[in-house]
Amino acid sequence: MGKYFGTDGVRGVANSELTPELAFKLGRAGGYVLTKEAAQPKVLIGRDTRISGEMLEASLVAGLLSIGAEVMRLGVISTPGVAFLTKQLSATAGIMISASHNPVEDNGIKFFGSDGFKLLDSQEEEIEALIDGEDTMPRPIGGDVGQLNDYFEGSQKYMQFLKQTVEGGFEGIHVAIDCANGAASSLATHVLADLDADISSMGSSPNGTNINACCGSTHPEELAKLVVEKQADVGLAFDGDADRLIAVDEKGEIVDGDKIMYIIASYLKEQGRLNNNTIVTTVMSNLGFYKALEEKQIETKQTAVGDRYVMEEMRKGNYNLGGEQSGHIIFLDYNTTGDGLLTGVQLLNIMKQTGKPLSELAAGMKTFPQCLINVRVTDKDAVKNNALVQQEIKRVEEAMAGEGRILVRPSGTEPLVRVMVEAKTDELCQQYANQIVDVVKEQLGA
């Protein structure tokens, strides 16, 4: 990770860490790096529903126009919507303003190249060097200054694409949705209604400050209540920028990213559409996920946490399905990044084609008890070299005797250390996790 870029673009508290001044510099430097080879550079900008989005958008636009790029504002749209449209409209670059599942005070800026993929490390390093160096980038004058246009109909083009990934509609399927008061709020309702699903919704009234507030993919228990109350067939919970999905079955049980990937990989294999009989996932996936796929004779490739690393492995090995337990699912046949709405549509299609309820589709995977505790710390990277923390991890691993797993890592986007433990029982899981958390707090706690 660089000075400004984390694992998922530039993030921080809006107007404090991620300031309009920094956004302007990112617009200039990012725009220059991504458009310097283009004769007529065109950059798309989308945002989620955060109150700070328009402030940062204005600064980004100014920076981009100042280097001579044409800017097309997409308005409120999902992150995968920006990625799709960047490639579809042959734009030089795309930019999304969002902090995904983070609280409203945070925001972020992520870039996409003309191919719709996230940037290479080398491109991010070049942008950072330009921000910190003397600004010698072009400053065109007169008619060469960039022009701003709105392209709000881009959302319609993206929704049309989503609908075309399945044949027929979802008549008779009752879907409960939680849009996290974010970018999916209008998109999900329109797409599912056009596909003839019956819809019950929550988290679909964004006001600029309620994004991810006790709703969405990080709080699927709220959707689970709605599914049971409305007797829905399935629940779909998105995050603020709709690049991830957590589902709920008809009984109100949560179906996380691992189970969603298991269901989709199994279906694609049956259809002969799983490239190289392999799915790509991260070290956070549950032991039960790997065991279930072994039984299906599906191979797995494991990467570091972060959908960018999943994507890199997918492109390297020509795999078409990958994702994370958190609900980032990548269908490389359709889009260039994780897409919650696309995942939801594909999941509904599998239910329709197989005639099976979600609970039955997910039943083939038995989840090992897993605890994930986030610890706020002063220096998240110090955890790797702290002798006492590493000592405690080793002690717990010995106690597990091969019947469990530990993963302690710094967050890629927040000042947190994430402690993940899997064990045979819930009690052991909690006990082992707390032992490690206590030492992390003592050594590094904020």
Curated annotation (Swiss-Prot):
Signal peptide: none annotated. The gene is glmM. InterPro entries: A-D-PHexomutase_a/b/a-I, A-D-PHexomutase_a/b/a-I/II/III, A-D-PHexomutase_a/b/a-II, A-D-PHexomutase_a/b/a-III, A-D-PHexomutase_C, A-D-PHexomutase_C_sf, A-D-PHexomutase_CS, Alpha-D-phosphohexomutase_SF. It catalyses: alpha-D-glucosamine 1-phosphate = D-glucosamine 6-phosphate. Its EC number is 5.4.2.10. CDD domains: GlmM. Keywords: Isomerase, Magnesium, Metal-binding, Phosphoprotein. GO terms for cellular component: cytosol. The keyword Oxidoreductase does not apply. GO terms for molecular function: magnesium ion binding; phosphoglucosamine mutase activity; phosphomannomutase activity. Catalyzes the conversion of glucosamine-6-phosphate to glucosamine-1-phosphate. Binds 1 Mg(2+) ion per subunit. PANTHER family: PHOSPHOGLUCOMUTASE (ALPHA-D-GLUCOSE-1,6-BISPHOSPHATE-DEPENDENT), PHOSPHOHEXOSE MUTASE. This is Phosphoglucosamine mutase. Transmembrane segments: none annotated.
